[in-house]
Amino acid sequence: MDKTQTDTGMARRTVLSAGLGAGLGLAALGLAGCTPSAKTSGSGSGWKQFSGTTINFISENTAPSAAIAANSKPFEDLTGIKVNITQMALENLVQKVKLDMSGGTSQYHVVYADPYQVLAPLSQGLTDLNQFVNDKKYPPVEKGLADFIALDAAGRFESKSKLYALPYDCPTMIWMFRQDLFDKYKSKMQADLGFDPTPSGKITWEQYYQIADWFNKNAKADVPYGTGHQAKQHDSLQCDFSNVLWAYGADYFDVPDIGTVGSQNPGKSTLTTPQALDAAKFYDKLLKVAHPSSTTWDWDGLGNAFAAGQVAMCPNWHEYAATNEKSLPGKVGYSILPTGPKRSANNWGGTGIGINANAKGNEQGAAWLFVNWATSPATQVMTLKSAKGGGTPTRTSVYDMAEVKKAEKRPSDMPNMLTASAVLEAWKPENIGLRPKVATWNQLDTIVYTNLSKMIAGSQDPTTTMQAMASQFDKVNG
Amino acid sequence: MMLPALLVLVLITVLPFIMLIAMSFAKVRLLGGVSLSMNGFGNWSDVLTDPATWHSWGVTLLFFVLAVGMEMIVGTVLALILNSMRRGQSLAFSLVLLPMFLAPITVGLLGNFLLDPTIGLYSWVMESLHLVGAHQSVFGSQTTAMLAVTTLDMWEWAPLVALIVLAGLTSVSPSVLEAASVDGAGYLRTLFSIVIPSILPVLLVALLVRSMDAVRYYDIVHITTGGGPANTTWVISLQLNEKVQATAVDGITTLIGQSAVIGITMLVFTIIIANVFVRVLDRRGLMK
């Protein structure tokens, strides 16, 4: 969930704030009052107090972290703090963070706290950031916590009284498509299919299937397959399927706010409802017309395949826009995902960064300065411009900046901003897709993608798949 | 004199092993320092009644047979070829050994790259030979995924078998080979009647080394298939890792106790395999 921005300036911001405030329960709005308004990062006092300290930041290998790793000198100049940045695949990060927190010391002071795989199961190993936010000896959070998008989902667990992380990135799944191919074939496709195939939230998943199938049969000269999916037996498969599950009106659990602040008592799963079964049946059907290599692609594999012209469209994280613009400049369009019987659902994959509770003394303070700096508007603009791939800002104010707004249209020096209108739409409460934030998510995630992998491989029918998932969920959650 | 070495040994092997056993009977909590609360045989019963664990053992056994079998055959053939070369043996030997020096994770990445259906060289070759369909990935099919990861492992470790066997081949008495030749024995007769029996102890050692390693297979399958599709490559190491990552519903207790049980069963399996081979060697009087 996250993001902001638009053509209409205030109107867009208003929509987003209202949407996020209501739908994501942004406690940030309430906390804003107790947050000192700040000037710009780099100004004011307090930045140099931990000069000479060295801290380590462990992150998933994401575009924003690559950008910060390539340009951390401004932070070191500002604070005198040396920061070492380690990047790795998320599953490896989870393991390292868990082991680090068990040792009583902290090898990693700043932690990339994925809400589902780190924050929920390990929240007790993270420091409550309110102590820094409210302490006058530290530079204030620029523009206050209210400026953050999806503060609850990225930063809290179970309770709104504690803040474990500040939103750091916010990739969201949207519909990526070859604009050039849709332009070329639009009239023929419309004549054959009987509807306007232009990607938008008005297109249903069933129509998405028909478009994919049409490309398979009629456009082989331009593109091998209509659609591709991140359907490897991996976390990515669960992410891809969740969009369809929610679109059909189903969910993993029926617990209020389980996607925002989360819960330790999710109760029985709701994966055997008629809507869930319909979603599974449709997803199974969709994968049958997808690029056959979909079952070997995670998000990176799908991103590379799309950039290589293997598929005409796909659902993927919006941060791949930067890659698209390098490989297919000017040829890619973006939309929110198709709608199901219930709604369009767009999986939010944002993450916060927090501080290891084992960090001591100066390390804690230095880590907070880094967290504050890395999530500041100025730094987020820097990552947006980075040649390393571009960031996905988590600050409302960033999307309101004139230079950022300008980048929404080509030619753009911030290619991720080309997705802005789609992402903004995706973040509306009625369109956002939030996975359940529960401590057992690592196990549940494996259950979901393992069973789905069996289903799309033909080893299990959709009904058996969902029943298996549900019973395994209930066993894990007691 | 031996005390420092023994202390080091205790620190790096005995204590962790004792800890492993203790964890297998306990609920393990990590946050705030490792703490164990005894759980009796709870972890053992959970693991031993878990269908997913048994499935992963089945997959591991299949991998074990395929990989070790292929490595023994290909490694032995490579060694025989190298041994018969009169020129360029050193260069060929160096090239053959190269894969062995790569980290398994690198082999997995190489496999991903070479077998990518869009840009992979091997995929292009196989597609040209109609061995796979257009845009089909060998990692994406239930029928080929296991074969693909097994072949990658074979590519990396057959050279080790070749190295061991080649060392054995140099010990075959030239006079015996000469006598066989004089008596009119052909290549195959000489190979199966003289060479193979002569290097049998070395072959068993190679088999033992590779067997012990094959049980712990993880890196390549992790990076290529992730255990899929449909769990067809979900080896026991992946199952162990899955338990290590998991957290119970209270958010604090981990399932590391269950992963400890799996680790111990892997160890037991390896010991059994090693003992079988050692007994075979001993029975044939080859241990001396």
Model region roles, listed by residue range:
Chain A
Residues 1-11, 22-29, 373:
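N-terminal secretory signal peptides
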Residues 62-82, 180, 448:
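Short, polar/charged alpha-helical segment
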Residues 34, 294, 412-472:
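C-terminal capping/gating helix-and-loop segments adjacent to ligand/active sites or protein-protein/ligand interfaces
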Residues 51-62, 82-86, 110:
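Short, well-ordered beta-strand elements
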Residues 207-216, 244, 248-296:
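Glycine-centered hinge/linker elements that transmit conformational signals in sensory
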Residues 42-47, 115-174, 240, 333-335, ...:
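Hinge/lid segment of periplasmic solute-binding proteins
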Residues 73-149, 165, 184-186, 190, ...:
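Extracytoplasmic "Venus flytrap"/periplasmic binding protein-like
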Residues 56, 73, 102, 161, ...:
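Extracytoplasmic/periplasmic substrate-recognition and gating elements
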